[in-house]
Design a protein with these regions (language model features):
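Short Gly/Pro-enriched turn/cap motifs at secondary-structure boundaries
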Residues: 47-52, 104-105
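Short proline/glycine- and acidic-rich turn/helix-capping motifs at secondary-structure junctions
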Residues: 207-219
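Gly/Ser/Thr-rich phosphate-binding loop
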Residues: 1-45, 57, 67
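Conserved ATP/PPi-binding loop(s) of AMP-dependent carboxylate-activating enzymes
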Residues: 51-55, 66-100, 137-139
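Active-site glycine-centered loops adjacent to acidic/histidine catalytic or metal-binding residues
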Residues: 3, 28, 50, 112, ...
Length: 232
């Protein structure tokens, strides 16, 4: 249960430790007490975060401009309403609270991108702040990381384990995509790997920065704030 996609390495480790067991991935945030959705043991769909809990309402809407519902299967911003949603941050002005009015209801704006199947099952697509708009298209930085980690080894920030990530992707203020890596990878090699993965030409690394190590937080996750600062 968490606010990030469960890494494939966790599924593999669970299958080895508990043969025949069922791993029920779910999703939640502190502001929603914290569970929003979860896979049921009798109907697990690996790679998804399941369906909303009873009494929890969700809406998947356009990430920019006035909210509008997106079609089933399309990626959009996740809104949540229900008795589990908190009342707001203490000491924060009302106009800075993470709520939005939509279809006559006040919703909590999660900042997360998901897609919703026709049966209501949700799939986590990433944090909005980990996307960059290029040529009018929302480009997933984690998707670029995943492709490059698979192509060059060393693991991404989610899969790296104790040795730390070998690469990470961030964008500068100008939207340029930067690959930070401890490996010897050229920009041409990185972009060739993205093309081989059949990603559109908008998924392109503008430059590569070699580092002795990728900065990480105390949680072991990549410190993207530090990387973004170095993009400036």
């Amino acid at each position: 249960m968490g606010a990030e996609k469960c890494p494939d390495s966790v599924y593999a480790a669970f299958a080895e430790a508990a043969p025949g067991g069922v791993l029920c991935e779910g999703y939640g945030v502190t502001e929603c007490s914290p569970v929003i959705s979860v896979n049921r043991p009798e109907s697990v769909l690996p790679g998804t975060i399941g369906q909303p809990l009873p009494s929890v309402r969700v809406a998947v809407v356009s990430a920019e401009g006035e909210p509008r519902r997106v079609a089933p299967g399309e990626t959009g911003m996740l809104l949540v309403s229900g008795p589990n949603v908190f009342g707001g941050y203490l000491g924060v002005d009302a106009d800075k609270q993470p709520f939005v009015a939509f279809e006559g209801t006040e919703w909590y704006r999660t900042g997360d991108l998901v897609s919703e199947a026709a049966d209501g099952c949700l799939t986590f697509r990433g944090r909005l702040k980990r996307f960059v708009k290029v040529g009018g298209e929302m480009i997933s930085l984690p998707q670029i990381e995943s492709v490059l980690a698979a192509a060059f080894g060393g693991g991404s920030s989610e899969e790296s384990g104790e040795q730390g990530p070998a690469l990470a992707v961030e964008s500068g203020e100008d939207g340029a995509i930067v690959l930070f890596t401890t490996l010897d990878i050229t920009r041409e090699e990185a972009n060739a790997a993205l093309r081989a993965a059949r990603l559109s030409g908008l998924f392109a690394v503008a430059r590569v920065q070699k580092l002795a190590s990728i900065p990480v937080l105390g949680t072991g996750k990549t410190d993207y704030k530090a990387l973004k600062a170095s993009c400036a």
